[in-house]
């Protein structure tokens, strides 16, 4: 069965194991998520739950949104997402960090930091040209392709806006769960800036 929860990235720190090994971890604060809707094959064509995270003021919600969350007896939510193939939860149920345990393998999704307009070296990792005084080629993108098509093919690696993309890191390990602080510690780094939305769910390729 799939497990999932929404949270906010707090930052990174490091912890030591009992053997003295240092592990870099990302701290994710996941206050209780509320199940707003249960979708089934009969009614919606697929099985999923819709969860809400992070309360917001009612004045920022319209009437349909208020009516939707009222079915779950909760406040309007800033973030609403779906998790497929989750069973055993009813509308109004809470999902806490205790859903996960140390040792679980998860996929973590976030929005990468925006870097603005960047060149091909930073954006795509291309090699630069000679930096000597006589060189006329330093940090340009280089060849645009062969002469014959008389055009540049779509998808050519060029300068442009970098970051701000939806990124998923697979098969990360849950190092520790702290229920009293609604915190999950995940091994390594995860995409996104501090305070950004993070989605944690059971790994699709765990054990492969």
From Swiss-Prot:
Which UniProt keyword terms apply here?
Ribonucleoprotein, Ribosomal protein, RNA-binding, rRNA-binding
Where does the secretion signal sit in this chain?
A: none
List the GO cellular component terms: cytosolic large ribosomal subunit
Region (Disordered) residue ranges read: 116-148
Annotated GO molecular function terms are: rRNA binding; structural constituent of ribosome
Presence of keyword Membrane: no
Q: Which GO terms describe its biological process?
A: translation
Record's function text: One of the primary rRNA binding proteins, it binds directly near the 3'-end of the 23S rRNA, where it nucleates assembly of the 50S subunit.
Q: Which family does it belong to?
A: Belongs to the universal ribosomal protein uL3 family.
Subunit structure, briefly?
Part of the 50S ribosomal subunit. Forms a cluster with proteins L14 and L19.
What is the official name of this protein in its record? Large ribosomal subunit protein uL3
């Amino acid at each position: 069965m799939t497990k999932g929860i929404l949270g906010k990235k707090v930052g990174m720190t490091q912890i030591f194991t009992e053997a003295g090994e240092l592990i870099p971890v990302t701290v994710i604060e996941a206050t209780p998520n509320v199940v707003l809707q249960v979708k089934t094959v009969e009614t919606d064509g697929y099985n999923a739950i819709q969860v809400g995270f992070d309360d917001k003021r009612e004045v920022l919600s319209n009437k349909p949104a208020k009516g939707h969350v009222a079915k779950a007896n909760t406040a309007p939510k800033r973030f609403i997402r779906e998790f497929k193939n989750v069973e055993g939860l009813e509308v109004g149920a809470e999902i806490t960090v205790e859903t996960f345990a140390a040792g679980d393998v998860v996929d973590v999704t976030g929005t990468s930091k925006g870097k603005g307009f960047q060149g091909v070296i930073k954006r795509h990792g291309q090699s630069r040209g000679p930096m000597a005084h006589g060189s006329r080629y330093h940090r340009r993108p280089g060849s645009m392709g062969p002469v014959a098509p008389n055009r540049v093919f779509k998808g050519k690696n060029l300068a442009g806006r970098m970051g701000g993309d939806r990124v998923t890191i697979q098969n990360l390990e849950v190092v520790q769960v702290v229920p009293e602080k609604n915190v999950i510690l995940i091994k390594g780094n995860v995409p996104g800036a501090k305070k950004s939305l993070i989605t944690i769910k059971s790994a699709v390729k765990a054990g492969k």
